[in-house]
Amino acid sequence: MNKDEILKEFGRNLKAERNRAGYSQDGLALKTGICAGKHIGKIERGETNPSLYTIISIMDVLNISFDKLYKK
């Protein structure tokens, strides 16, 4: 997999987990306190590479482990 494919897969999985948890993009952004809802959208579309801190903050709010976001 190349970088773009990894980011798109990560984004699709993030969107699925966010929806499962019942958060909107804005709601997740507010709960993490780290970014705006449109930034969550960019992550979900694979348009940006989130920092490790952002990923960990999202995982904490959604109460998930990394393997839910990236499945090899």
Ranges and model annotations:
Residues 22-42:
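Short alpha-helical DNA-recognition segment
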